[in-house]
């Protein structure tokens, strides 16, 4: 079993590497999907950020979950136990994600900007894997290890600080990420599983991003010409 120093040292080490990857992506102007759609970034930079998150956070999650003997129920979905309130939250997340995407500004129709044919499907697949690993790290390993060591209140507070710091580079997400973080932590604690947080996060993020891509389908068509 890992000591406290080793456990939190690993968490901070891999978290810092991921934070550095995010900062680099934002500095290069390609940290988010909207940067690609508005001609401010390159797909490669966005994929680099996502893959870095999968690698760094995934490696940390695998190492700590194995050495700290976290109960398998934390990482196992229990579909029959999920109550109506959770499905209502998921539905609300989809609606909010879709509505927020409808307010985004897109390139003009006469823009010469185009996206590679592989981009939509590959982005959705990589993004889905990223969000699952992301929640395994934040609402799985970090949250439940800290609850065991430090108690619920401290664990949630630290989780929110780490989570909000990831979103600090986008001033539109800074404060919303705190609210989202509270919801995701509470859902995970209530069900003693990371999967409710995964479902809520996937529902909000993917509905938003898929709608953005659909609204920009003309960019995909241009790549045929």
Which residues are covered by each model-predicted region?
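Juxtamembrane helix-loop-helix connectors linking adjacent transmembrane helices
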Residues: 37-45, 64-130, 136, 144-149, ...
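Transmembrane helix-loop-helix hairpins at the membrane interface
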Residues: 20, 107, 116-225
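Small-residue packing motifs within transmembrane alpha-helices
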Residues: 5, 12, 17, 49, ...
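Residue-identity detector for glutamine
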Residues: 32, 83-85, 192
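N-terminal, membrane-interfacial amphipathic/helix-forming hydrophobic leader that caps
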Residues: 1-76, 154, 209-225
């Amino acid at each position: 079993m890992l000591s406290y120093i080793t456990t939190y040292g690993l968490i901070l080490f891999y978290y810092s590497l991921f934070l550095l990857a995010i900062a680099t992506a934002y500095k290069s102007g390609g940290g988010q999907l909207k940067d690609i759609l508005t001609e401010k970034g390159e797909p490669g930079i966005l994929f680099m950020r996502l893959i870095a998150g999968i690698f760094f956070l995934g490696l940390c999650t695998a190492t700590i979950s194995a050495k700290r003997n976290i109960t398998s129920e934390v990482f196992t979905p229990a579909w029959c136990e999920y109550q109506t309130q959770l499905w209502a939250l998921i539905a609300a997340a989809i609606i909010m994600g879709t509505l927020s995407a409808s307010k985004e500004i897109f390139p003009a129709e006469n823009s010469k900007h185009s996206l590679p044919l592989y981009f939509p499907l590959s982005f959705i697949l990589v993004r889905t894997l990223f969000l699952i690993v992301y929640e395994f790290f934040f609402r799985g390993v970090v949250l439940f290890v800290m609850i065991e060591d430090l108690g619920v209140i401290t664990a949630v507070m630290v989780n929110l600080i780490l989570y909000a710091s990831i979103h600090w580079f986008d001033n539109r997400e800074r404060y919303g990420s705190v609210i989202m973080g509270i919801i995701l932590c509470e859902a995970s604690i209530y069900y003693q599983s990371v999967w409710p947080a995964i479902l809520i996060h996937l529902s909000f993020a993917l509905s938003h991003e898929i709608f953005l891509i659909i609204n920009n389908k003309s960019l995909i068509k241009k790549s045929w010409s």
